[in-house]
UniProtKB/Swiss-Prot annotation:
Belongs to the universal ribosomal protein uL4 family. One of the primary rRNA binding proteins, this protein initially binds near the 5'-end of the 23S rRNA. It is important during the early stages of 50S assembly. It makes multiple contacts with different domains of the 23S rRNA in the assembled 50S subunit and ribosome. Forms part of the polypeptide exit tunnel. The lineage of its organism: Bacteria, Pseudomonadati, Pseudomonadota, Gammaproteobacteria, Alteromonadales. It comes from Shewanella woodyi (strain ATCC 51908 / MS32). Keywords: Ribonucleoprotein, Ribosomal protein, RNA-binding, rRNA-binding. The gene is rplD. HAMAP family: Ribosomal_uL4_B. This is Large ribosomal subunit protein uL4.
Length: 201
């Protein structure tokens, strides 16, 4: 199959398996959920009454004080006491094998092509790290909400895009399922397309 280059009167020959396969919604959903889960820290932790530092002594005698009976200062109803059902650190990570991950990326790229959301250009960059220059260049192409994918991170392009809302720059190694579906359009250079094909096999 062929992808038409937006900035040139030519087309790029690409693999049907990478850019023309059926959309596997269940697989993409599973990989996106796993990717988000793997980003979680899971380090929250609270102390139970057994873990709170403090004496085990009964604060006052059982009868005769007029106060409510109390057996510990570490109970959940006391200020500074333990938490009844204390949260503990958890590992939220989900295993996704390479075949599934690559399959999800292929599904996403194929769907982007079908929806005309994948824009392929011969090359893309800015001469200086100026937000104004990049904004004007994107406006010419009628692009606002866009992920720009290049073979390697162009520092000028990265710095120019850093202050633009809903514009991000990634190299091929830095793309992931969440970022690909988070933007309205994905702008990819021809060299990046070749790298993506090599990466996804």
């Amino acid at each position: 199959m062929e992808l038409v280059l937006k900035d040139a009167q030519s087309a790029l020959e690409v693999s049907e398996t990478t850019f023309g396969r059926d959309f596997n919604e269940a697989l993409v959903h599973q990989v996106v959920v796993a990717y988000a889960a793997n980003a979680r820290q899971g380090t929250r932790a609270q102390k139970t009454r057994a873990e709170v530092v403090g004496s085990g002594k009964k604060p006052w005698r059982q009868k005769g004080t007029g106060r409510a009976r109390a057996g510990t200062v570490k109970g959940p109803i006391w200020r500074g006491g333990g938490v009844t059902f204390a949260a503990k650190a958890q590992d939220h990570s989900q295993k996704v094998n390479k075949k599934m991950y690559r399959g999800a990326l292929k599904s996403i790229f194929s769907e982007l092509v079908r929806q005309d959301r994948l824009i392929v250009v011969e090359s893309f960059g800015v001469e200086a790290p100026k937000t104004k220059e990049l904004k004007a260049k994107l406006a010419e192409m009628n692009l606002e909400d866009v992920l720009i994918v290049t073979p390697e991170i162009d520092e000028n392009l990265f710095l120019a895009a850093r202050n633009l809302y809903k514009v991000d720059v990634r190299d091929v190694a830095g793309i992931d399922p969440v970022s690909l579906i988070a933007f309205n359009k994905v702008l990819v250079t021809a060299d990046a397309v070749k790298q993506i094909e090599e990466m996804l096999g």
